[in-house]
Regions:
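Motif-centric detector for short Cys/His coordination patterns
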Residues: 1-101
Length: 101
């Protein structure tokens, strides 16, 4: 395992902040990682309340947004992994939101 992979596995999320264009995650080792919100289309389409409704999972290994049905791992953020959701899956999710709304 590379040292960067080991660091990613050891870093835990402690706090999350979502602005109109950025997802920021504070880590247990003192770092803050910030990525464009556009990396995660469900959060882009979510309301402020939905974006702010998150919980840490796995003791801080990841973050879950229940209303957006999305999870992000700290490791993924640290290696620059964007959402892997297909455009078709995102469109189905958006359609379900329109029907429910």
């Amino acid at each position: 395992m590379s040292s960067s992979a080991a660091e990613a596995r050891e870093a835990l999320a402690t706090a999350v902040s979502v602005t109109a264009d950025t997802l920021s995650v504070d880590l247990s080792d003192g770092r803050t990682v910030a990525v464009p919100l556009s990396w995660f289309p469900r959060r882009v389409h979510g309301t402020r309340a939905e974006r702010d409704d998150w919980s840490l999972v796995g003791g801080g290994l990841g973050i879950h947004w229940p209303a957006l049905d999305e999870d992000v791992s700290v490791e993924g953020l640290l290696v620059g992994r964007m959402s892997g959701e297909s455009p078709q899956s995102l469109e189905r999710w958006l359609q379900q939101r329109r029907v429910a709304g």
